[in-house]
Amino acid sequence: MSENAGTPKKQGRNNGAVVMMCLSFVFGMGAMSYAAVPLYRIFCQVTGYNGTTQRVDQVSSVVLDRTMRVTFDANVAPGLQWDFKPVEREVNPKIGETIQVNFTAENRSNETQRGQAVFNVTPGEAGVYFNKVQCFCFTETDLKPGEKLDMPVVFYIDPEIVKAVESKNIHTVTLSYTFYPKEGPKPVASNEGGAEKIEKKL
């Protein structure tokens, strides 16, 4: 009798352990999925994988007697009514030379909009050698209705690009940007209205 009575309790404990293991697995997979995007972004920034350019604080001390053709591409994702384009479609700096180019963005909507630029370089092998000293893509951009903004990019091509087997024969690279909408802070009036509603409810 005692052995039979103890069996359901043991099975219950086993079932509980299985449930806990399943829940832990589900939560663990969810956490990994949430962290995958920022971790992948960090990996690309460090390695230059997938055409991600490098961010640096200093310029190159070496300038080669060889030029690199750099073309520019500008795009705007749905949700932003912006006119976004490069001032120059291409430049031909010397490899290692620090150069500034400019883009312009104009808000065509009747409301303030916030955007964040995402960038990459093609061919992807050149990404690790494309170094940005200054870029509007490092921060979010707010544009009021009808506002037009000049946005500089300061960069250079690392001279090491001519030494690597996978990149030494590259003569043209394309720097591409896409602006995506970002949610801005709520207006103060909206917050105050919410506070009044809470006070009345209390």
UniProtKB/Swiss-Prot annotation:
Disulfide bonds: none annotated. GO terms for biological process: respiratory chain complex IV assembly. Gene3D superfamilies: Ctag/Cox11. It is a single-pass type II membrane protein. One of its GO terms (molecular function) is copper ion binding. One of its GO terms (cellular component) is plasma membrane. The keyword Transmembrane helix applies. Residues 38-202 are periplasmic. The chain crosses the membrane at residues 15-37. Coiled coil: none annotated. It is found in: Cell inner membrane. Residues 1-14 are cytoplasmic. SUPFAM superfamilies: Ctag/Cox11 (SSF110111). NCBIfam families: PRK05089.1 (NF003465). Belongs to the COX11/CtaG family. Exerts its effect at some terminal stage of cytochrome c oxidase synthesis, probably by being involved in the insertion of the copper B into subunit I. This is Cytochrome c oxidase assembly protein CtaG. It comes from Rhizobium johnstonii (strain DSM 114642 / LMG 32736 / 3841). The gene is ctaG.
